Amino acid sequence: MDYKKTLNLPDTSFPMRGDLAKREPGWVQQWEENRVYQAIRAASKGRPLFILHDGPPYANGDIHIGHAVNKILKDIIVKSRSMAGYDAPYVPGWDCHGMPIEIQVEKKFGKNLPVTEVHAKARAYALEQLDRQRQDFKRLGVLGDWDNPYLTMNFSNEADEIRVLARILEKGYVFRGLKPVNWCFDCGSALAEAEVEYADRVDPAIDVAFPFTDKAALAGAFGLDSVDDGAIVIWTTTPWTIPSNQALNVHPEIEYALVRVSPTPVHGPLVLIAKERVEACLKTWGLEGEIIATAPGQALDGLRFAHPLARAAEGYDRTSPIYLGDYVTLDTGTGVVHSAPAYGIEDFVSCKNHGLADADILSPVMGDGKYIATLPLFGGLSIWDANPKIVEALKLAGSLMHVQKLSHSYMHCWRHKSPVIYRATSQWFAGMDVTPEGGGQTLRESALAGIEATTFYPAWGRARLQAMIANRPDWTLSRQRQWGVPMAFFVHKETGALHPRTVELLEEVAKRVEKSGIEAWQSLDPRELLGDEADSYEKNRDTLDVWFDSGSTHATVLGGKDHALHGSHGEQLAWPADLYLEGSDQHRGWFHSSLLTGCMLYGQPPYKGLLTHGFVVDGQGRKMSKSVGNVIAPQKVSDSLGAEILRLWVASTDYSGELSISDEILKRVVEGYRRIRNTLRFLLANVADFDGVNQAVPYGDLLEIDRYALVMTAQMQAEVQAHYQSYDFHPAVSRLQTFCSEDLGAFYLDILKDRLYTNAPGSHARRSAQTALLDITQTLVKLMAPILSFTAEEAWKVLADSALKHQADAARLTIFTEVYHTLPPYADADALAGRWGRLRAIRADVLRKLEDVRGEGLIGSSLQAEVDIYADGEDLALLSALGDDLRFVLIVSRATVHARAGELAIEIAPSAHKKCERCWHWRADVGQDADHPEICGRCVSNLFGAGESRAKA
């Protein structure tokens, strides 16, 4: 007789190999065809809301690995909250206006298109790009309202953004002014703080002499009767700002020195610098010198000095006053700072505080980076080309003390990677220190208070955002571009004042934009709204910063506080969002702009929590770079290993720091995935012939080890759910993997195989095991689902067609309409866990001894062994209570417990009996049944008799 055919060997349609890259697209298609996202919404109706508001990626170019990390993290959170019993809609969005798309249109169609054509082509380009990205995001297994995303260029969003502008204008935050703003010559526009990045750059660092003019006043400041000729000396890394110098700054409390130097420079024998910098500066200049007098910076206030280029050209025949400034330091330079108010924020503030009028500020640099043609010596030159010529002119004028090349960290445009300058231009701002109409906190105060009320993941994000808000300048709202939401103001042609009905007029414009898009503003004849006043006003041509676009989506998409605006998705979403989740660069980007708009509109942040993830680096910690050749594209991983592997990599990596990825790292992830899949396959295969409704054993009647397995599973589920709740995914993955490999694979399932395979198919013992296994399988598959979405859905389908075939059709459609599995509560759960925890420890000791004996060649498998255990006290009672079931726990052919005082002792010997051909146990009764001499008495009973009885295991 072929006894193998009498075993209940596991069988399942769930394949051992995932073949993920081939199978996953089929699941994506099924989810779309079955309208799974809509099914989740229907199943979740009435539950508490959880809103993760999607930070919109820019609709330009294919997604990269950073996008994949971001969307996968969001998907894990949304799915885990949904399965935890929340209604967690996910509306993806795209950022559609702005420079990069405008540049692409210019590249394709040229620079001189009419605005209407720019808009039409930009819209078409954005739609084409976001559709490519949408397909890639879907391929990652991300579920969401993909057919109805929010787009910042949707007419309703553009209209509501104009309404947001109207509200913050009405509250008094918006003003126009001349201020130095970040300016990119390639963009031809102001930049937001978030659009500036830092990179090393080499520039000439120069020490420049400003000759004495009023020597009598200078002598008085130092308590001298008179002084010789000389100069005050500054240090700068921006020679191009020297033609625009209008002041000098010293620190009021720093001690300054008059130093007689030799050999004598062109300007005379004296130099004026900070006393603490004398030694270092003289060494740099190659001069000898002695201090003849000192005075605090306070005493120098108001003294004037000649422009260093005065000898080079008449146009520089002017003087520069000293202003006191607390920001002057002694780290480098001379302790004296040159001030060009058009090109530095502190310079601007200092000069304005000392009465310099906007009209008197010298700003010879045009928007393209060239000096105006009338600037003496350097007119028409680009400032970067002018740098060496300015150095040469200073040298010829006798004003150059020293020059050297300096590599330093400098501002660059994040799009063009070209250097950025501060440039004073007339712009529209949101004032950080403006008190709103009706009183209350300033925007800065409100934002800082809002940060305190926000939960940060990880916690260090709070200090980072606080520092940025505390120190940031006013927000430059305006941009000089075409493809953007208009700052739809009517400005008086003579006075520059806004029309007195601006708030009302903005609403009229918004209504038109709602119907026709921002194009409505371009085609609007002012007479339609202003009537006879139209001749006195002109349309403002500025557009809004794209960070205002995305930063106001909490209002334009979610609908704002108390649905103050309708919001494109306001009916299914809520304000404030529970969570914003983006990369760490968004502390200065979307987190930042959203905080400011939320506080301007409603006095609070639009989010309850902020989650930050790090950037992706290679296995050696290097940034992804095409030139280095270490770029890993998510599309390639999906097409080779499967998106599931990317999802598992994201979840198993600590996202709070840098996320390392390489072929070797992904290989390890694949191995981890296989272990989980193999566990899942074993579980599914052993409940394939089980009807979870009609064949289940009541929970109170389960064998003790099965009850313990459910207690163990409940503990694991509680831990994993807690990790999901706090967004700690890598410990969740680790716990799931440990559960599969140690709790199940190395313990429970290992013990269970004998009972599952050898007991009668419908026996109580086997059905007890299957009852527990079905609960464990459902628990595991549901806990895996937020991370391993494709695999969980595949397993759920197998379960739905077998052990769960009597479930309702809605539940069988997808696992994602489910909530986490409810396991039976056991009153004696702690006692069970304690007993079996100790049994597992003893079992581990026995397994180690068995390995030693196997190593000596005395036994093959553990079933060839017989074990004697000597114990007393609680251990004796614990082991004795198992009776004959102890051998199944230890997976040996005989296990005998003996009472003996002292430490627990284990003895192992090879069995002298024959091996049963069916169960492979070595038993004394093998051969005693004449009809079936090859098998043991237990197998005879299980096959032809009443079957064995099991109580514990």
UniProtKB/Swiss-Prot annotation:
GO terms for molecular function: aminoacyl-tRNA deacylase activity; ATP binding; isoleucine-tRNA ligase activity; tRNA binding; zinc ion binding. ATP binds at K626. It is found in: Cytoplasm. L-isoleucyl-5'-AMP binds at E582. The keyword Zinc applies. Zn(2+) binds at C916, C919, C936, C939. One of its GO terms (biological process) is isoleucyl-tRNA aminoacylation. Binds 1 zinc ion per subunit. Pfam families: Anticodon_1 (PF08264), tRNA-synt_1 (PF00133), zf-FPG_IleRS (PF06827). The keyword Aminoacyl-tRNA synthetase applies. A motif ('HIGH' region) lies at residues 57-67. It catalyses: tRNA(Ile) + L-isoleucine + ATP = L-isoleucyl-tRNA(Ile) + AMP + diphosphate. It is an enzyme of class 6 (ligase). A motif ('KMSKS' region) lies at residues 623-627. CDD domains: Anticodon_Ia_Ile_BEm, IleRS_core. Its EC number is 6.1.1.5. Its cofactor is Zn(2+). SUPFAM superfamilies: Anticodon-binding domain of a subclass of class I aminoacyl-tRNA synthetases, Nucleotidylyl transferase, ValRS/IleRS/LeuRS editing domain. Belongs to the class-I aminoacyl-tRNA synthetase family. IleS type 1 subfamily. Catalyzes the attachment of isoleucine to tRNA(Ile). As IleRS can inadvertently accommodate and process structurally similar amino acids such as valine, to avoid such errors it has two additional distinct tRNA(Ile)-dependent editing activities. One activity is designated as 'pretransfer' editing and involves the hydrolysis of activated Val-AMP. The other activity is designated 'posttransfer' editing and involves deacylation of mischarged Val-tRNA(Ile). IleRS has two distinct active sites: one for aminoacylation and one for editing. The misactivated valine is translocated from the active site to the editing site, which sterically excludes the correctly activated isoleucine. The single editing site contains two valyl binding pockets, one specific for each substrate (Val-AMP or Val-tRNA(Ile)). This is Isoleucine--tRNA ligase. It comes from Bordetella avium (strain 197N). The lineage of its organism: Bacteria, Pseudomonadati, Pseudomonadota, Betaproteobacteria, Burkholderiales.
